[in-house]
UniProtKB/Swiss-Prot annotation:
InterPro entries: Chordopox_Fusion/A27. It is found in: Virion membrane. Belongs to the poxviruses fusion protein family. One of its GO terms (biological process) is fusion of virus membrane with host plasma membrane. This is 10 kDa fusion protein. GO terms for cellular component: membrane; viral envelope; virion membrane. Pfam families: Vac_Fusion. Residues 9-22 have a biased composition (Polar residues). Keywords: Glycoprotein, Host-virus interaction, Late protein, Membrane, Viral attachment to host cell, Virion, Virus entry into host cell.
Length: 89
């Protein structure tokens, strides 16, 4: 038996126009549609990344605001306690 027997049984990768190509005839997506979907997914990923970054920045700002409000409330509570006689300065 010769080593080259069966060498050309599979279609070549650049033979996408052939309707007898088993992969494309079975309904698999074409190279162009895969590229379009990949570009779409990359755009979506970029949009989501930007949105998460903005949300993170807003959350950091709110956390700092919350901390400053907490500190102000503790100071006010201490002031009220001193003025009402519950604690000493």
């Amino acid at each position: 038996m010769d080593e080259n027997d069966g060498e050309n049984l599979l279609t070549q990768p650049d033979d996408t126009g052939n309707s007898t190509n088993g992969v494309y005839a079975a309904g698999a997506p074409t190279k162009e549609s895969v590229e379009e979907r990949l570009v779409s997914l990359l755009d979506s990923y970029k949009t989501i990344t930007d949105c998460c970054r903005e949300t993170g920045n807003r959350l950091d700002r709110l956390e700092r605001h919350l901390e400053s409000l907490r500190k102000a409330l503790l100071d006010l509570n201490r002031k009220i306690d001193v003025q009402t006689g519950y604690s000493r300065y």
